[in-house]
From Swiss-Prot:
Principal place of residence: other
Propeptide: 18-45
Summary of the function given for this chain in its UniProt record: Probably a component of the fimbrium tip. Fimbriae are filamentous appendages on the cell surface that mediate cell adhesion and biofilm formation.
Keyword Transmembrane: no
Signal peptide interval: 1-17
Lipidation (S-diacylglycerol cysteine): C18
Biological source species: Phocaeicola vulgatus (strain ATCC 8482 / DSM 1447 / JCM 5826 / CCUG 4940 / NBRC 14291 / NCTC 11154) (Bacteroides vulgatus)
Known partners and oligomeric status: May be part of the fimbrial tip.
Keywords from the named record: Cell outer membrane, Fimbrium, Lipoprotein, Membrane, Palmitate, Signal
CDD domains, alphabetized: BF2867_like_N
Family note: Belongs to the bacteroidetes fimbrillin superfamily. Mfa-like family.
Location relative to the cell: Fimbrium; Cell outer membrane
Listed name of the protein: Fimbrium subunit Fim1C
Gene3D superfamilies, per database record: Fimbrillin-like
Length: 379
């Protein structure tokens, strides 16, 4: 099916508003086409969703609801996405386009828009992005049932963005200049990086290497699946039973580890020995994305979420041998008010070293006097 310029055409539309069966004829010569423009509120990197990644990848999905002049707030409880449902917007030929062209109503009807990204082509089951959309016949603002993707060592995670701003509600032929301006916001929480450093200068003969990392989510703190509501831009538990991460999540294979030979030590690891500049455990182009805890509030208490880190302290013996001290599951409590919606977090972990210190008393213990010994020298 040909993708037309984000201004589309459909001569006959089914309108579900005050009358679910109302039919409105639209003439392409008198109705202006609806155009689109896109902006992501927070410019981000790598696997994050940005305007650039929207253009290059799957694009985004649009919901549009037509109401009478009374507007969205008055009629949303009885209105379905009758104007557009999961309409796929893509970037082609230097402009945004979509397949089923729509025109602005010429009367006082109003159009309210919602959008999300990345696009899910199977919205009833969420096969592609783990995004399941509310149905085409569902009344009121749409919802997304979202499941955190943990496949491919956490590297398949997606950065869900949405637009539910009031600026794209109750649009009319008179008030709109032809183009709908979508402004997406990040609705997950991002772990941008975890960085590690020692608290002292290790010198030249000691190194620290991080070998593993786990997230301890508690039992009822961190959703692995939840419902996002466009109506109030919040997350809530799925029904009837909330779904949480309830066991430790091993993030070790997500880390940006390498293998080098250091005095015979050659584990896959990350050298975090610099005490002046904390070393990142993640690649520059990757981050972790989770459903936020308590929306914009984050965790209630310090330690509601914890990290567990594994590392080796390696001391040189010769150029080809070493002494290694292995520390496993060193627990770090994350602060309160973390994992907030729309916020990216970087955690800097400082390893406290117990250096062996040497002191010398200025006044040595006195000599013990011994008695004179008579020694005979034989001729």
């Amino acid at each position: 099916m040909e993708v037309k310029s984000l201004l589309m055409v459909m001569a006959t539309l089914t309108i579900a508003g005050c009358s679910q069966n109302e039919m409105t004829e639209m003439n392409p010569d008198t109705n202006r086409t609806i155009g689109l423009d896109v902006y992501t509120e927070v410019q981000t990197r790598g696997t994050e969703t940005t305007t650039s990644t929207l253009k290059a990848n799957a694009g985004f999905g649009i919901f549009a609801y037509q109401t009478s002049s009374a507007g969205w707030n008055s009629e949303k409880g009885n209105t379905t996405p009758n104007f557009m449902y999961n309409e796929h917007a893509t970037w082609t030929s230097d402009s945004w386009g979509y397949t089923n062209l729509r025109f602005w109503p010429i009367d006082d009807k109003k159009i309210t828009f919602f959008a999300y990204a990345p696009y899910e082509s199977k919205p009833e089951v969420g096969t592609d992005q783990k995004i399941t959309l509310s149905g085409q016949n569902a009344k009121g603002a749409p919802t997304i049932t979202f499941e955190v993707k943990t496949s491919n060592n956490w590297k398949d995670m997606i950065d869900l963005v949405t637009d539910c701003h009031t600026a794209i509600q109750d649009q009319t032929n008179e008030s709109n200049k032809g183009t709908v301006q979508f402004k997406f916001s990040h609705v997950l929480t991002q772990i941008a990086n975890i960085k590690v450093k020692p608290d002292v200068n290790l010198g030249t003969d000691t190194k620290i290497f991080v070998t593993g990392l786990k997230l301890d989510p508690g039992s009822t703190t961190l959703y692995n699946k939840a419902v996002y509501k466009f109506d109030n831009d919040t997350w809530e538990a799925i029904s009837p039973d909330a779904s949480y991460f309830s066991t430790e999540q091993d993030l070790s294979d997500f880390l940006n580890k390498t293998t080098t030979d250091q005095w015979g030590y050659n584990k896959s690891s990350i050298n975090v020995s610099d005490d002046q500049n904390a070393t990142a455990l993640f690649s520059d182009t990757e981050a972790l994305y989770f459903i936020p805890v308590n929306n914009k509030n984050g965790t209630t208490n310090a330690g509601d979420l914890k990290l567990k880190i594994n590392y080796d302290i390696v001391t040189k013996v010769t150029d080809t041998s070493n002494l290694t001290s292995t520390i496993t599951n060193k627990e770090v409590s994350l602060p309160k008010n973390t994992f907030k919606k729309g916020t990216k977090h970087t955690y800097v972990l400082t390893i406290k070293m117990n250096a062996i210190k040497i002191t010398v008393e200025d006044n040595m213990e006195g000599w013990t006097d011994d008695s004179d010994s008579d020694i005979n020298v034989e001729k």
